[in-house]
Amino acid sequence: MMAAASSGPCPEGQQNHGNFLDAPRLERGVTRFWLIRHALVEENARAMMYGTMDVPLCPDSLVAQQPMYEALAHRLPSDACWFITPLSRTRSTAQAIQNAGYGSRDVTVEPGMLEQELGEWQGLSHGEFPKRLERAPHYFWPLSGEEKPPGGESMIDVCARVGSTLERLAGAYPKQDMVLVSHGGAIRAALAHALKISADTALHFSIQNLSLTILECHDGIWRVVTVNELPGI
């Protein structure tokens, strides 16, 4: 996890300078993405490869992790544009953050930030899933970056989709803060795009539930500000 400054104006004498981020706060007027992985899903869903299935959040976790929602509500810029994916777990997570003190905001559904589509393999148990693979799985992901399930996507496909989405949003919302409640695979794909690394390399990043990853786009050049920051911890 990498620590990062919060968003807002820098006090006099504490400005970021040159190419460095060394002030307590991030400067305004930067095209900045605040990527949040959705909260923990319910127990039955965690027993299978749910991919893009629309599974609900864990109700007990919603209560137990209330301090994390409050920390995110305080951490995020107050004037950000909000985006979720078509799956209810991202909408529910966004709602919980807003209810925890951020305040109600309109959200825009962005399909380009969906999780990896596992096609015919979705819904398989964790024990059954490896039997379907044609390639060795990634050490930190159920399948390699090149593995493409029947009717689904490879992580290489996800990286291309997410990269295109980020470029489009950066062009549509220049110099604005954007909160994107998304998924672990999609956030790894965003890092792959920002760092120009392979899908397999990006899968080495840990992206935990409710973690925050911040990316910036400066005239088409991407910077990673923080990865897998856990709110309130």
Residue ranges and their predicted role:
Residues 48-51, 96-99, 122-125, 193-197:
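Short, glycine/charged-enriched secondary-structure capping and boundary segments
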Residues 100-163, 216, 226:
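Phosphate-handling substructures
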Residues 66-73, 159, 163-171:
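Generic structural signal for well-ordered alpha-helical scaffold segments
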Residues 84-85, 160, 181-182:
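Short beta-strand scaffold positions
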